Design a protein with these regions (language model features):
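Basic helix-turn-helix/winged-helix DNA-binding cores
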Residues: 1-68
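Alpha-helical scaffold segments that form or flank carboxylate-/histidine-based iron centers
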Residues: 15, 35, 42, 122-133
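Amphipathic alpha-helical dimerization/coiled-coil segments
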Residues: 56-111
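Secondary-structure edge/capping motif, primarily at the C-terminal ends of alpha-helices
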Residues: 79, 108-116, 150, 154
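Heptad-repeat amphipathic alpha-helical coiled-coil interaction surface used
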Residues: 87, 94, 98-101, 108, ...
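Acidic interhelical loop/turn segments
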Residues: 106-128
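Long amphipathic alpha-helical coiled-coil segments
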Residues: 146-164
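Charged, long alpha-helical assembly modules
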Residues: 160-189
């Protein structure tokens, strides 16, 4: 769980361990006991009814992503704190992203050697791995950019001026993405 679904679908451990029991209760999974040394573990497997339910669920649209991140909330309200506090939060964000990047590198090297812990779904794992790696890189890049911007601000952050070049760059990137998408859809002008 720590290296797979938990990275994008975080839930309390108690909830994660409770859910398979619910699937068994609804006939969507089967539970078998297995001895590991002195301990007994439960192995869950999907039933034919569970496969049908999963296939039906996969045809439905999913909910859009939700971003819930306390450090980003602190960046949002930073004018009520100190510049030093904001810089510290940005550094924590960058360090978090760099640590995840390092984990991603280890996962990717292991994957090249063994196809990972679930070789039967290696192709799907590459899609997920690329997304997570790109996301962590984007966060680290953003945190570095934001740090550079904040370092140029006065200590009284209420007097900071917005980086209009950054806004122009966002507008230009959006226009370029839209043009590329339209060109791909309709061909060159």
């Amino acid at each position: 769980m720590e290296r797979t679904i938990r990275r994008f679908w975080p839930r309390a451990r108690s909830k994660v361990y409770e859910e398979p029991k619910n699937l068994v209760a609804h006939g969507l999974a089967r539970a078998t006991k297995d001895a590991v040394g002195r301990r007994t573990r439960t192995i869950y497997s999907i039933t034919p009814e569970g496969r049908r339910a999963l296939a039906a669920w996969l045809t439905t649209p999913g909910e859009p992503p939700v971003l819930e991140w306390e450090q980003l909330v602190k960046v949002f309200f930073a004018e009520h704190g100190t510049r030093a506090d904001l810089l510290a939060h940005l550094e924590q964000i960058r360090q978090w992203a760099d640590a995840r990047d390092a984990e991603d590198a280890v996962f990717n090297l292991e994957f090249l050697q063994t196809r990972g812990p679930f070789p039967q779904r290696a192709a799907q794992n590459v899609l997920f791995g690329r997304f997570m790696s790109d996301w962590h890189t984007m966060i680290a890049t953003w945190a570095q950019w934001a740090t550079t911007v904040v370092l140029a601000w006065p200590d009284d952050m209420s007097r900071a001026e917005p980086d209009l070049d950054a806004v122009r760059s966002l507008v230009e990137r959006r226009i370029a993405r839209t043009a590329t998408r339209l060109e791909g859809k309709y061909g060159p002008p």
